[in-house]
């Protein structure tokens, strides 16, 4: 967790947990041969927050520990954020810690989380509707963050602090049950402890195993992504995994990679029940003929572009049209309602052709159709060639999005 010569930034609120962590790291820093710096952020949520800041600064002077402090008006940021006050405070705090660590040259950031914090987080996530891997929370070490106290209960830390006379301040809002975390701590956890007095240890074991499971799943997902996920201009496509759990995790990964967030697990499960599910701001997941598309709903503008050269590239397609006729002009456009094509003397709806050839629904408005001046469909790239397209006009589908044509090849007979 710590190596000789490292510089550790210690997150200190002034409460008993973080002050005890600062005390322990200061005490053992000569033995561990590490350098420590304290960091305190005033969230300006409470009137007494300035008192906490001054307390931390005073103790750090007494203990000869460098300290970095700052303040952020979290309530102002919270007003129009659409998030809870606790969520905003956490985001601001972690941002401050990362920036401060970089400023002072610290390679590690020490946090005072313990087993009770772990229990409260698990309960909170279960209430909100987490997936199974969502229980892999608060790891002992992740990126630059370390949590040396995660193996201890709150009661053990408090007992040690009393024995050593560690100074600290009390945050009066810790007892205000209007905050979700406090409600869990003071109302729900005591009931759980009536059923199992060592519930903190039980949850710690559960989370430890879930971390191992998450690591395995992350490796499996990464391997699948590297082999099967394709990103285009405004969407991604991948082969639909046979395993439903892998499907959910790959979908989560793609959503986070593209948009920086994921839906609640309950909403994500909805993709197993429906062919198409929309989340926030028009973001969708659509399943069709063994492929999955993830993107943002965009109402495609109808276009009609004259073919003037041999090569055209659009919507992930690359086509070649060699016009050997001086008496004909061609255009490409996307499909229209009621489009039909005549092949071998038989007229068929373009929609039926797409279904028969198992063209995923999310490609049907993207494929560039070759038409004549009468707007008749002459060629559906890789799918069908009309009787009206002269034989001396050369057409070829050179590139296309994954899954557009099955089997990795294309054919033009209907």
Curated annotation (Swiss-Prot):
Does the record carry Disulfide bond as a key word? no
| UniProt protein name | tRNA(Ile)-lysidine synthase
Q: Which HAMAP family match?
A: tRNA_Ile_lys_synt (MF_01161)
Gene3D superfamilies named among the record's database cross-references: HUPs
Its cellular-component GO annotations read: cytoplasm
Q: Which PANTHER family match?
A: TRNA(ILE)-LYSIDINE SYNTHASE-RELATED
* Ligand binding (ATP): 13-18
Q: What's the EC number here? A: 6.3.4.19
Tell me the CDD domains matching this sequence: TilS_N (cd01992)
Name the job this protein performs.
Ligates lysine onto the cytidine present at position 34 of the AUA codon-specific tRNA(Ile) that contains the anticodon CAU, in an ATP-dependent manner. Cytidine is converted to lysidine, thus changing the amino acid specificity of the tRNA from methionine to isoleucine.
